[in-house]
Design a protein with these regions (language model features):
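Active-site glycine/GP-rich loop and adjacent strand/helix microenvironment
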Residues: 1-207
Length: 207
């Protein structure tokens, strides 16, 4: 009703809500592709894989609403700023006048480009609670090559996972979002709970 009443062209939304909005429109025989919405700045959930392709959630939205442009963001309350995609959709751009970002390993040393690291920030525009090398706990890649849009600042990948949530399973390491993408890709799975525990041998098990 609000969309039809005020005719917005852009919205800021959690991607999962877009899925619910699409389902509501289909259930009520509303053609959401003809509404005024053309772009959405998405918060709270990842839309893309590290190679910039849409993940399962992003694909589901794009398939149902192909005319809607989806822009990913990365932000936190502590930053009071965000990394936001441009129209090239190749990672979130750093705003260097607002924040300094580092990507650190477990020893607090900078990782090499192409290696995942913990996003660590120093705020420049926050007066009430400035932060120096604040560890977010989020693991991301950094991209340093110039973007096709013309900007040459560091860009940020989608979040691979939380540092404390890394799972060691059958000789490899992974983060919960990788499991969620697999489950989200199964049409008949609507809701799920993933349980991870350590067995008697000291290795992780996934249910």
């Amino acid at each position: 009703d609000t969309i039809h009443r005020i005719h917005p062209t852009c919205g800021m939304v959690v991607p999962s809500f877009l899925i619910k909005l699409i389902e509501f429109a289909e259930k009520n025989q509303i053609d959401h592709n003809t509404c005024s919405m053309k772009k959405c700045v998405c918060i709270g959930e990842a839309l893309r894989n590290p190679d910039f392709t849409l993940n399962t959630l992003g694909q589901r939205i794009s398939e149902k609403w192909p005319s809607l442009q989806l822009y990913s963001t990365y932000a936190s309350t502590e930053m009071q700023s965000s990394f936001t995609e441009c129209s090239e959709f190749h990672g979130g751009h750093l705003q260097p006048e607002l924040i300094i970002v580092e990507f650190l390993d477990d020893k607090n040393l900078p990782v090499k480009v192409g290696e995942p690291g913990e996003v660590t920030i120093t705020t420049l525009g926050v007066e009430g609670m400035p932060l120096l090398r604040f560890k977010t706990g989020d693991i991301c890649y950094q991209y340093t090559e110039p973007c096709a849009c013309g900007r040459n600042t560091i860009r940020l990948s989608s979040v691979l996972g939380r540092k404390g949530q890394m799972i060691k399973y059958k000789g490899t390491t992974l983060y919960p979002p990788a499991l969620f993408d697999i489950l989200d890709d199964i049409p008949r799975v609507k809701n799920y709970v993933v349980e991870v525990y350590t067995n008697k041998l000291g290795t992780d098990e996934i249910l």
